[in-house]
A protein has these predicted regions:
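Transmembrane alpha-helices
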Residues: 3, 67, 75-78, 86-87, ...
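Hydrophobic alpha-helical transmembrane segments of multipass integral membrane proteins
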Residues: 1-8, 12, 105, 109, ...
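Membrane-interfacial helix termini and adjacent extracytoplasmic/periplasmic loops
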Residues: 20-24, 37-70, 101, 134, ...
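C-terminal transmembrane helix and the adjacent membrane-cytosol boundary/short C-terminal tail
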Residues: 20, 79-90, 94, 100-106, ...
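Interhelical loop and adjacent transmembrane-helix boundary motif
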Residues: 128-180, 206
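Transmembrane-helix boundary motif in ABC transporter permease subunits
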Residues: 1-30, 47, 176-183
């Protein structure tokens, strides 16, 4: 879910930079997923699979239910990031001979990478403890929140307390790892800026 949220949100951010036909409708559809009750979305996905005579599982209906919750946040974050991205940087890269793919790979992605990590954190956090949207469409394989609710209804066990204790530590490790990645990316970017300044600051350079 986290990887798909990052990928689709990034592509949506690129698409919304262009004034394509229907972009306003797409934007309001994204916002509608935030407004609609979680149970109704889960029920709609479940009924859709039932009408198509398909079996809903965690990698089909469950995945769609989770993405309907994580993608709106990811898309809105990427829209804010791309709105602040200076297009003259990409134009300068093209003036230096870069094509569209090289400009995307060496300019756009490095600049927006911290934002994509933030989108990934949002996607992980929202999906990790999602219950209402998953309860009706996960099939026979339950996610952790659904399984914990089911076990709690039949009586608490030591394993349930152990899982409840380890869950915050696992989430904390993911958050710390993300901050470390952002720190090293910013440090690397600062080093590249210093190297460029030294290059162009030398006498006779250029």
């Amino acid at each position: 879910v986290m990887v798909l949220t990052i990928l689709i949100s990034f592509l949506a951010g690129l698409a919304f930079r262009k004034n394509f036909r229907g972009n306003i409708i797409m934007f309001y559809l994204v916002v509608a997923c935030l407004i609609a009750p979680s149970f109704l979305i889960s029920l709609g996905i479940g009924l859709g699979f039932a009408n198509l005579e398909l079996e809903s599982a965690w990698f089909t209906g469950g995945l769609g239910a989770h993405l309907s919750w994580t993608l709106p946040f990811g898309v809105l974050i990427m829209l804010a990031i791309f709105s602040r991205l200076n297009k003259t940087i990409e134009e300068a890269a093209r003036d230096l001979g870069a094509n569209e793919w090289q400009s995307l790979r060496h300019v756009v992605i490095p600049i927006t990478l911290p934002g994509m990590i933030a989108v990934g954190l949002f996607g992980f956090t929202l999906s990790y403890d999602e219950f209402p949207r998953t309860s009706l469409v996960s099939g026979t394989d339950n996610t952790l929140p659904v399984e914990m609710v089911a076990v709690t209804g039949t009586g608490a066990t030591p394993s349930l307390y152990a899982v409840g204790t380890m869950t915050p530590f696992f989430s904390l490790l993911v958050i710390i790892g993300s901050f470390i990645a952002i720190y090293f990316m910013q440090k690397r970017r600062s080093g590249q800026r210093i190297s460029s300044a030294d290059l162009y600051g030398k006498p006779g350079a250029g």
